[in-house]
Amino acid sequence: SRGLGDVYKRQTKLIRERGVMNGRLTSLRPDSAAVEDLKGWAITDAVAHVTCREPYQIPSPLPRHHVVLWDFGAKQNIIRKLHALNCDLTIVPASTTAARILSYSPDGIMLSNGPGNPKDNPAIISELSHLCKSGIPIFGICLGHQLLALANGADTEKLKYGHRGANQPVKDLLTGRDYITSQNHGYAVKNDSLPDNAVLRFINLNDGTCEGVSYQDFPGFSVQFHPEACGGPHDSEFLFREFVALIERRA
C-alpha cells in the first residue's frame, strides 16, 4: 500500500544516516521497555543453527585431493566448485576440533561462509589457530576469512552499512586487477590490525576495507567475498584453482 511505502521510505533514510540498526515491524506503538529490549537484541549461536549435525563425505568420481570443509553454514556451490576440481570432500560440523580434522588426513582445509559476528566463535578460533601450525593449505571464505584472521591475531569490526549485493568491486593488490564480486556481510577484518605474517591482498574499491589476506608463515589465504557465487559474477572463481595449486605444491 501507499502508506506502507512511506514507512519503508522513512526507515531507509534513517538507516542511511545512522547505519545498520535493529528494527521491528509492528502495528502498535511500543513502550519504552519494548524499545530497550529491541536495542539489546542480538543474534546468538548463529553458526550452531546452520552447520551440519554430523560429518559426511562427498566422494569425487576422479579424486585427486582430499579436502575437509569446515561447515559454518556452507553454501552448496562451495561444494560444487571443489568437487569440479576433483576433490574428495569431508564436511564437518562447526564444533569439530582441530585434532579431529587432522585425523581425516586432509590435503587441504576449506573454511566456509557463515552468519553472525565472528568474535562469537572463540572455540572455533582457538582450534583454527592449531590448524594454522599444521602446514596444511587453508582457504577461507566470508566468515571463514574473518575467523582465520582472528586466529592469527587480527581484529574485526562491524561495518556501518555492510556490503550486500552481486556488484561489489574489489582490487587484487597482487596483480592490480579489479573484479566484480558477490558479497553479503556486516563485519570486516580491520586493515591496520593485520599481523606481520599477513599481507593485505584484496581491498573493497568503495570503502577500502579488507577483502582478502594471504599468509606468509603457512600456506593459507582468505577472501571476504564469495568466489563461488551462483547466481552472481564468476570473476573470482580462479581462487579455487589457487587453493588446489597450494595443495599440489605441498604434495
Predicted region positions:
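A glycine-centered loop/beta-turn motif at secondary-structure junctions
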Residues: 212-250
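Redox- and metal-dependent alpha/beta enzyme cores, enriched for Fe-S-associated oxidoreductases
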Residues: 78-80, 94-104, 111, 139, ...
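Residues that mark the start of a beta-strand
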Residues: 64-68, 88, 137, 180
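Flexible inter-domain linker/hinge segments
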Residues: 13-66
